[in-house]
Swiss-Prot record:
Highest taxon, organism lineage: Eukaryota
Protein's pathway: Mycotoxin biosynthesis
Record-linked Pfam families: FAD_binding_4 (PF01565)
Function: FAD-dependent monooxygenase; part of the gene cluster that mediates the biosynthesis of cercosporin, a light-activated, non-host-selective toxin. The perylenequinone chromophore of cercosporin absorbs light energy to attain an electronically-activated triplet state and produces active oxygen species such as the hydroxyl radical, superoxide, hydrogen peroxide or singlet oxygen upon reaction with oxygen molecules. These reactive oxygen species cause damage to various cellular components including lipids, proteins and nucleic acids.
Record carries keyword Calcium: no
All residue ranges annotated as the FAD-binding PCMH-type domain in the record: 78-255
Origin organism lineage: Eukaryota, Fungi, Dikarya, Ascomycota, Pezizomycotina
Organism of derivation: Cercospora beticola (Sugarbeet leaf spot fungus)
Protein name: FAD-dependent monooxygenase CTB5
Keywords, comma-separated and alphabetical: FAD, Flavoprotein, Oxidoreductase
Coiled-coil regions listed in the entry: none
UniProt-listed Enzyme Commission number(s): 1.-.-.-
Principal EC category: oxidoreductase
Family, per entry: Belongs to the oxygen-dependent FAD-linked oxidoreductase family.
Length: 527
């Protein structure tokens, strides 16, 4: 396609659509309109304005542009300067935008690059934005809401999980979503995030019943177990490589309030936590109602503390202080500051727990995530803590500096996913796993340290992986939603899984628009 002229591009689009057998109906008039907008324009943003209308495209001098750029979770994405931002309000708007930008890329070679922003939570630079290109900000996309029988809920990709929970909690229902409020549905579902309920039900992506997707041709299609099932499967973990998800339909399940909260401890108690964590994470069988994160935090003026997240998701009735967590509850608790509680344990709903967890996150800052996995091992948890502490000491005086180490168990019952249909493929971990969600944040004034911190984190993780391999406890797995830009989740999937994903990409995006024109996120390997 890159060698074709515009008239050839336009004339070939119906053929392209027909290549995607059974995907949807192609409407030539829509492409004629997009072509007319491109032909009469001087730039990609000009063409987009003609296609969508001037009220749906904003520029650097507009307040709505500043609001969009300032609302990313990580200020690293605010470093970029898109030429314009499109604010679609329907799947049809997204369709027009994609058709226009696909055609525009051939009139203005090397231009019309675009990013797609749902919730805007992925922290690395360029994940959902682009410099001198276009951002499609899905913030204004509508949500259909809960079904009459409460069995499903359909929401836009920019809807945050706590708003989903709020609707479902009112009906004693829930779904798989992130543990932290404020994160968008789109990225967490296409990246297969983890939930309080993951030991029972698997990954967030495995709860998706239907995707509404805009393909590179501009066609709006449904992908589910019956329609375009290969696309449905690919999007369950395939991230942004196949199209733009404009609506997500999630299955729900019965779930009432449950027991949980946070407990706070002195860093000196960490060895006790590590031993309890190893026992919990190694359990066979694993208690599927047990959710636990051991969190070590450097913050608050320069000291470490521990803030654990404990939930036991059994409800009707809820079970307070269940047997599985009694060893954890014996460890002495210490308020972070005098006058603060030593724990927040109570019976509550998932909306409340997710918002409590989010309240511990400072906005806005520059953030970096990363992930490492190993077999449950208390000694290695201490080793990694010491390595992390040593690696980051040179940065602890940066304004707003915070380091968070989240040790999370991933039992085989979660990793195996009960035969779920998704694009994670077989996860060969030789048993239960502990993975670390690494998060570093600091103030905007310290942006000059971005590259140095990234290099230090890479060196740390390479050394830690080497040590884990030496000890025989390395596990070839990372949680996709916790990966940094240098940790492609696709490097951890089987060859057959990658081949299947690439074949699906070429089927639904034969001109590879989402591989070449959308640089953000994690791209599929070239095979």
């Amino acid at each position: 396609m890159l060698g074709l002229n515009l008239q050839q591009v336009l004339s070939n689009v119906p053929t392209i659509s027909s290549i995607v057998s059974g995907v949807g109906s192609y409407q030539h008039g829509s492409d004629s309109s997009a072509w007319a907008s491109v032909a009469a324009s001087k730039s990609c943003c000009d063409a987009l304005t003609k296609s969508l209308g001037k009220n749906s495209v904003v520029f650097p001098y507009d307040a709505a542009y500043s609001q969009s750029m300032g609302s990313y979770f990580s200020l690293k994405n605010s470093d970029l300067h898109p030429s314009c931002i499109a604010l679609p309000r329907s799947a049809e708007d997204v369709s027009k935008a994609v058709r226009t930008l696909s055609l525009g890329a051939h009139k203005w070679e090397g231009q019309c690059q675009f990013g797609v922003r749902g919730g805007g939570h992925t922290p690395f630079k360029g994940a959902a934005s682009t410099d001198n290109g276009i951002v499609l900000d899905l913030l204004h996309m509508p949500s259909a809401g809960i079904s009459p029988d409460y069995e499903t809920i359909t929401v836009s990709p920019s809807t945050t999980w706590d708003l989903v929970y709020e609707v479902l909690d009112a009906h004693n229902r829930s779904t798989l979503g992130t543990k932290v409020a404020g994160i968008g549905v789109g990225g967490a579902s296409t990246s297969c995030g983890v939930s309080y309920f993951s030991p029972r039900y698997g990954y967030i992506c495995d709860m998706v019943e239907n995707w509404e997707v805009v393909l590179a041709t501009g066609d709006i299609v449904n992908a589910n177990a019956n329609e375009n099932p290969d696309l449905w499967k690919a999007l369950r973990g395939g991230i942004n490589n196949f199209g733009i998800v404009t609506a997500v339909t999630l299955k729900t399940f019965g779930q009432g309030p449950f027991w949980g909260g946070q407990t706070f401890h002195s860093i000196d108690t960490r060895q006790e936590h590590f031993k309890n964590h190893e026992k919990l994470a190694s359990a066979h069988p694993y208690d599927p109602y047990a959710h636990y994160i051991n969190t070590l935090v450097w913050a608050n003026g320069g000291h470490w503390f521990i803030g654990n997240s404990i939930q036991y998701t059994k409800s009707d009735p809820p079970v307070a202080e269940p047997e599985v967590f009694k060893p954890f509850l014996k460890t002495e608790r210490t308020p972070i500051f005098p006058g603060l509680p030593e724990d927040t344990l109570r019976v509550d709903n998932v909306t409340s727990f997710s918002r409590e967890y989010a309240a511990n996150t400072l906005y806005p800052q520059r953030w970096q995530f990363a992930c490492i996995s190993f077999a449950p091992d208390a000694d290695f948890m201490e080793t990694f803590f010491q390595m992390a502490n040593d690696a980051m000491q040179q940065y602890v005086k940066l304004a707003g500096f915070k380091l968070i180490l989240n040790y999370q168990p991933a039992p085989t019952v979660q990793l195996e996913r009960n035969g779920a249909v998704d694009s994670l493929g077989p996860i060969q971990t030789e048993g239960n796993v502990v993975f670390v969600h690494w998060a570093v944040s600091y103030d905007e004034s310290e942006a000059q340290f971005d590259d140095a911190i990234t290099k230090s984190v890479q060196d740390l993780f390479h050394a830690a992986n080497a040590k884990a391999k030496e000890l025989g406890i390395y596990r070839h797995f990372i949680q996709p939603t916790y990966a940094d830009s240098w940790q492609s989740p696709f490097d951890y999937r089987s060859k057959s899984t990658i081949e299947e994903l690439v074949a699906t990409s070429k089927k639904y995006d034969p001109l590879q628009v989402f591989q070449k024109q959308v640089p953000g996120g994690f791209k599929l390997p070239q095979i």
